[in-house]
Every structure is written in C-alpha cells, then in structure tokens.
Amino acid sequence: MKPAARRRARECAVQALYSWQLSKNDIADVELQFLSEQDVKDVDIAYFRELLSGVAVNAASLDALMAPVLSRQLEELGQVERAVLRIALFELSKRDDVPYKVAINEAIELAKTFGAADSHKFVNGVLDKVAPTVRKRK
C-alpha cells in the first residue's frame, strides 16, 4: 500500500478515535458509522481498522506510556492530542514495520492538521521523551 494511503488511514483514525473518546461508544460501532459517513477513497482501510482496534484494545497501556512525561494530568489532555499520541505510541510499540521516525513525523503532521496551534510541538515533546523507551531508534 502506498504511503499516502497509510497517511489517510491515520487521518481517518484520528477522527474516528476522537469520536470514540468523546462518545464512549463501542469502537466497532464508531468504525461502521465512520466508514458509512466519510469519504474513504485512497485510504488503507485495513490499516485504519488496525489502528482503531489496536488503540481501543491497548488504550490503558498507551496512556500509561505517556502519563509520566505529560506536563498535565492525562484527563486534561485535549482529545485530538490524545488520539494522535495513542496512534503514534501504538505504532511504536506494536508495529515494528513502521520506522521510528515515520511514526513521530506522522504524529506531528496529524497534530498540525487536526490540533490546536501548538499541538504539534506538544506531541513532538511527548514522543521525544517516550519513544526511546518504547522502541530503539531505527
């Protein structure tokens, strides 16, 4: 699959995870609703599904990875930033085929696209501290 299709999968995953985090609905229901309502042309659907289910199943452990380095309580973290960080930490911890730098750079780009003005700086700072403990640089 092309890198652009993976990027689109990540973009869609941020949006779907944002909805899931706010609604607390079952992730499978969120996925079905998202896929039926959104334009998913040029999206790596299999990767989108893997990100959604992987983050949902591992949310507590992903949050535990980031919590020690956050400058505020996890509950105070913006929903976009939380979704972006969870995706990056899922990729770093569970997807060895995704290079270290790619996971971080993609997270920064997602934060620039969906987050507040300085979200990308915050995401970069958190991942710079957490990523080396999750996976050796590749």
Curated annotation (Swiss-Prot):
Key word Disulfide bond present: no
Pfam entry (one): NusB
SUPFAM superfamilies with a match to the protein in the record: NusB-like
GO biological process, one term: DNA-templated transcription termination
UniProt KW keywords: RNA-binding, Transcription, Transcription antitermination, Transcription regulation
Domain of life: Bacteria
The keyword RNA-binding is annotated on this UniProt entry: yes
InterPro entries, A to Z: NusB-like_sf, NusB_fam, NusB_RsmB_TIM44
Stored CDD domains: Terminator_NusB
GO molecular-function terms, A-Z: RNA binding
Any single Gene Ontology cellular-component annotation: cytosol
Function per UniProt: Involved in transcription antitermination. Required for transcription of ribosomal RNA (rRNA) genes. Binds specifically to the boxA antiterminator sequence of the ribosomal RNA (rrn) operons.
Family of this protein: Belongs to the NusB family.
Name of the protein described by the UniProt record: Transcription antitermination protein NusB
